[in-house]
Amino acid sequence: GHAGQLPIDGCGRRDRSPFESSLPSASAEHENVAETSTPDGDDLLPDVPPEARPQHVAIIMDGNGRWAQRRNLPRIEGHRRGVKALRTTTELCVRLGVKYLTLYCFSSENWKRPQPELNALMNLLEQYMVEERGELVRENIRVSVLGRREQMPASALREMDKTVELCREHSRLHVCLAINYGGRAELVDAARNLASA
C-alpha cells in the first residue's frame, strides 16, 4: 500500500492506511460531518501523536462517475457527491491540523469525455468556487490552482481567480486544486521549453 493515503469513498479506490479506522469516511454514503467529532471537541485521532499526523494530504478524484453508474444514477450525480465529499474532507483536514490538501480534480485526459459531461463538470467547478468562497474566507483557507489554463472556460477561470485572490493571504489550510493537469501535457510543455531554449 501507499503510506499516508486515506480512502475516501466516492473519490476512487485507495490503499488502506493506518488512519482508516480512526477517521470517518467522507462519501455520499457518510455525509454527516457533525459525526466526525464529539460535541465537546475531543481529538479525532487521540491515539496518533500530532507529529505523526499527515501535513499534506493528496486526493486523486477518480471514480465518481462510476460510483453513480453502479447506483443507477447519472454520472454528474457522482461528481456532485464528490464535491460534497470534498467539503467534508476539507473540514476534516482543518480539524486535524493538516496544512496542505491537494485535490487532483480534472486531468487533461478528461477532455475526452462527452461534451454534456464536460459542460456539467465545468459548471460544477464554477459553482464550487462561488458557493464555497465565503466558507473558505471564514475558515482562513488559502486556495491555489495548478495546471494549464488553456481550454478552461472563461467563466470558470474568472471564478477561480476571484477565489484565489480573496484567499491569497490565508494560512490555516492550503488547498491546491490541480485542474487540467497531466503527464502528457507536462511532456508537451517540457518539449516546447526545450525547443525555445
Residue ranges and their predicted role:
Residues 2-5, 30:
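Low-complexity, intrinsically disordered or signal/transmembrane-proximal segments
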